[in-house]
Swiss-Prot record:
The keyword Translocase is assigned to this record: no
Chain's gene name: ftp105
Residue ranges, compositional bias (Low complexity): 650-664
Name of the molecule in the record: Ubp5-interacting protein ftp105
Domain of life: Eukaryota
InterPro entries recorded: Hid-1/Ecm30
UniProt subcellular location: Cytoplasm; Golgi apparatus
Summary of subunit composition and partner proteins: Interacts with ubp5.
Disordered: annotated segments: 650-671
Originating species: Schizosaccharomyces pombe (strain 972 / ATCC 24843) (Fission yeast)
Matches recorded under Pfam families: Hid1
Amino acid sequence: MGGQESKLAFQRGIARLASQPDIPLDDEVWVSLWSVPESCPEVYDFFPPGLIREMRDHAFVNLEKLLLVLTSRLFALKNDKKFPNPETAPASEALNCIRLLTRIIPFLNEKLDLEEWHQKFWWSLRKKRNLPKENSELDLSNFQDDLDFENSISQKNEFSQKSPSVPLSPVSTFPASSISLDASSDVSAADVSVGGSSTIKEIGSIEETFTHEKTLMEELLDTVFRLLFCRGFTLPLSSPEQYAYIIWENGIGTTETQEKTTKELAFNRIEVLRLLLVLISKRLYRSSEVASHTLTYLTCVANKQLILVFLYSLINTTLRLRPDSWKASYSTLVPYNDSSIALSKLTSQILLLFLDHTPHETTVEYFRQRLNLSPGAAIENQYRLYFSRLQLQADYEFLVNELYRLLNAPVSAISAYISIVQKPNIAFPEIILFLWQAILYNKRFRAFLITSPYATEFLTSIQFYALRYREDNEHSGLVRICLFIVHYLSCEKVLCEKLNRNCMNAQSLMSSLGFSVPPMSYAEFLIISSFHISAVKRSPFSSLSPVILLTICNIAPFVENLSFVTCAKLMQLCSSLSSPRFLFRNPRNHLLLEYLLQAISSIVENKFSQNPNLSYSIIRLQQVFLNLNSMKLPAVAQTKSQPLVALNSEGSSDFESKSSDNTSLDGTPLQNTDFKKVATVEDDSPFDELDKFSSPFSSSSSRGGLSHISSRNVSISVPTVLQDVFSDSPLVLSRKLRGKIPENVSSSELIKKCASNPFGKDLEIDSNLFAPSNSWFNSWHSRLELDSILAIISQFSLPVYKKMNEELSTTDEAVKLLANSVLNDVHPRVPNFRYFIWSVPMNNWFQSLVWLYTLSFDEKGLMATPSLFTTSKVYKQHGNIMKVASPENSSNSMENATKSILDKLDLLYLQLPSSVNHDSSLRNK
């Protein structure tokens, strides 16, 4: 029936599905569903969205029959011992059934008022008349039993969404018998199915035998899993059995080399995985999280052995990706026509969703009653459990090597190509998401990763991606995950001790993004890149500023040999965060200052002699610290109503007089500028970093003019010439305006074009609702860790001043003096790591992020064609789906909830002072 005439007849037949109310089951249109189409695009062409919606809205009985016919034919093919057989059980028929289900189900999910129907149709127990047939021929007359049973369900038993119990039916009145899918394993909640037989007396004392079947969705999911491990369909013909639990690719759980997968087998796997992804996609069509029976059954109730083999297959297939067009991965060129790309995308998305799923209490109660379990019986995610139990070193080596290869490919391409036209892009962001889950759910793997030679390279690559996409709203969720990973790894002492090594790729990585920096260590790369991520105006990651600063706190006790460039960034942050205008805007802004002062104090107390540049920078910036120490609420409360930047004429003239020795971070003179403290940011979109215009510590020549700094209001017994070289509120100049300013513009005119402190919006709420009080001020001001900083100022200000006034003396001499000195009355502190706490709301946000990338990949055709979701109303339901995890979507309740959670992270840190709580929190998950 593959000819043109049969296709035209088939097209006329399926048109009747929407126009004719109740098509008989003996009509030839049902059989032609799996025999006529020859490809997936043909199936999608025969069933356009309008036809499916019309059938759903006006001929729903036909749609129910269609689903029953397709699933039953698929079950019959699966049960055929010769499948796949071109004569009796062809694989093409199974593929057509799979394609039709993949096409139709999204349009059922998009209609919200079908929720009760979903529960009755897919999750109600069924009865089947026992038949002696063993072949795969489908007797359509037998479907009347199913339809009668569905009608009895609708008439007699109204399912309430508030009750998680199994709907009552003639079948459910019998005790459910639990049988194990795997005879060799113990019976438990993870490997139990329901079935059995009974004899029901009919009218006239005629006895017929019926089987108590599993629900239709359970049977469909079991069939899908069987087809994923079917000889000749998704497994090589050399497999010993028709359905064999064989891991698809070499890697975790395999000791023997697996046979290479042919393109035909790969395409069949893609088709089945596409259906599996559609079956668990109801979350896309709901504005909030819903209880998913499907995901819970797949992750918690399915057969243990199958779960284990499928988990290993998903991981190995995802990480074994070696596309033919990989050479172009550093650019935006992604190989769309490579079947391995689609297979890897599908396996990675399903893997992430399975590992992340936490069963909803409603679903847990449903399956407890469904499986006759005790009320307190545990139903947990088996994928997460088995992954957490990985412990073989060979498995860890495979994970680390393959993750490093995939993450480092775009990064290594930067140094491999002389001319980089575009910024390097990551073609597989799901790899970063999987890395986060790996270190979150397997503590032994995290320890192995930290001790591996690739540990610092992992940290560099992840931080680089956060820096790369800091202004890309589409990848804002990815940046958050990157920052979480870096923060989580920064809590490990073994890794922190490695961060003082020279970072070989730092200059090439930063230059690829337009930053000019000198050679630096891994620790300096983290500090400078963190500065460029957070210290930007209107940053979408302002709520993550506590995470970023606490990452610096974690590595601070181990940092050595900080350069002047890095110290300048720390001093800029300190100057911005200590501004009264910033501190009194919000009742929680002081937390950022506390975290930064903790980091600086930790460096001073633990590595004073190894960081003379930082000590010198503190002395240069001493006025900020002295003012902060002597700050009083009555004296500064009025700054709340004053402009953030206020320079008088005297300050302006002094501002201009110091422009002659202005240099950039790399020591090169700045051309056509007569200002020194101007930052470069964006005007209308995400703002860029405070860049090279803001550092006075560029070279010995520019640092030698310490004695020329004017004296202003120093209220401590130190030389008045040691004056702050930073403004309390650094000025910011938009990138758009930078190229339009005339060469000889005055500073007063330039100030008018400058914006305010880039931290001005961090953690901000309505400032009109907050009135600072003495109790609030004293509660945090007394906790500021200024003792070690003030000790440096008190002990070394005069010696440094005298050293700088000596003839032929340079800044290097002063730095050498500090390096050979000992800080009195200051003792090292024990490192106190702050750990990130992953909670259930964060799980929900992570799941939405995974679906965000799923939709993005599907829209681009990266998960095979045709698209799975673009023709359904998932986009219209969410508005622009790319805004689900976007920080600018103020109308999205999910993102608002996520931002609220992230804004409160600082409170979590205050409640978690030691690593003991961290370990206990992991055990309680």
